[in-house]
A protein has these predicted regions:
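A structural signal for well-ordered alpha-helical segments within the folded catalytic domains
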Residues: 22, 73-80, 192-199, 216-223
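Aromatic/hydrophobic pocket-lining residues that form π-stacking "cages" and hydrophobic walls in ligand
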Residues: 1-2, 27-28, 227-228
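Active-site rim elements
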Residues: 65-66, 184-189, 207-212
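Rossmann-fold NAD(P)-binding glycine/threonine-rich loop
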Residues: 1-12
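Predominantly a Rossmann-like dinucleotide-binding segment in NAD(P)-dependent oxidoreductases
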Residues: 11-15, 19-110, 131-132, 235
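NAD(P)-dinucleotide binding in Rossmann-like oxidoreductases
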Residues: 99-103, 113-196
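C-terminal helix-rich "cap/oligomerization" subdomain common to oxidoreductases
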Residues: 8, 161-162, 200-236
């Protein structure tokens, strides 16, 4: 494989999952890794959007062209980056709306190796604001809806992304006690992750940094995506 070849030749192999380079994601990872949320318990991710008919040329209607392979791979990579490695998945797919050869919607249950469990849903047939494309402001082609699309919860707090809105107890941790929110400022984000990704690439070539997303990271995310497709096919 490419990963094995790169290791054998002692060269770096990078994967273009640009969302990892987003300063919002970097701050979220710092928050999680610092233990501010406590022990992670569960997560929920949404990618709901509506793709117009002229989006679907022939290859996007084929078995390799659905939103799980095209879009969900980025969400899975971020969950791995923020929460940890994924141990098992169970998924359902549907093509009930577009009635094509490939799925238009899917839901996935995730179990992470650290004990966190999560859910994820994706559809390209829903008119909605809850997707990374519409909420992050990374790409100006997508109208920014200023909503969240990822939620990560722990024993001492929870976090919404990309709003960077955190929630924690004021006093005792109890559903009878008040909780408060704090939202970190998020600056103009247009194209920032792509330039940061290029900076990392240059620094890796110069021997100054390690890859933010290695070839092995890309392979691990791809293996999760393949497991999601297999689970939907065999019903396990």
């Amino acid at each position: 494989s490419l990963v094995q070849c790169a290791k054998k030749k002692n060269v770096h192999l990078l994967t273009g999952h640009h969302r990892r380079h987003n300063k919002i994601i970097r701050e979220a990872k710092d928050t999680i890794d610092s233990g501010q949320l406590g022990r992670l318990v569960t997560s929920h991710s949404m990618c709901w959007l509506f793709k117009p008919n002229d989006y679907f040329n022939s290859w996007r209607e084929s078995i390799s062209g659905g939103p799980v392979l095209i879009n969900l791979t980025h969400d899975i990579d971020l969950m791995r980056y923020l929460i940890g490695e994924i141990e098992s998945v169970h998924s359902f797919e549907s093509n009930a709306n577009r009635k094509g050869k490939v799925e238009d919607s899917a839901v996935v249950s995730l179990r992470f190796k650290n004990g966190t469990i999560g859910t994820l849903s994706i559809s390209d047939t829903i008119v909605a604001p809850w997707s990374w494309e519409h909420t992050s402001g990374e790409n100006p082609i997508y109208p920014n809806q200023k909503e969240s699309c990822y939620w990560i919860g722990g024993t001492h707090g929870s976090l919404e992304l990309p709003k960077l809105k955190s929630w924690k107890s004021l006093n005792e941790r109890s559903w009878w006690e008040p909780i408060q929110s704090n939202q970190s400022p998020t600056d103009n984000n247009i194209n920032q992750p792509l330039s940061a990704q290029l900076d990392n690439f240059i620094s890796v070539v110069q021997g100054k940094e390690e890859p933010v997303c290695s070839g092995e990271d890309g392979l691990k995310t791809l293996l999760v995506i393949e497991a999601i497709k297999l689970s939907a096919t065999i019903g396990k």
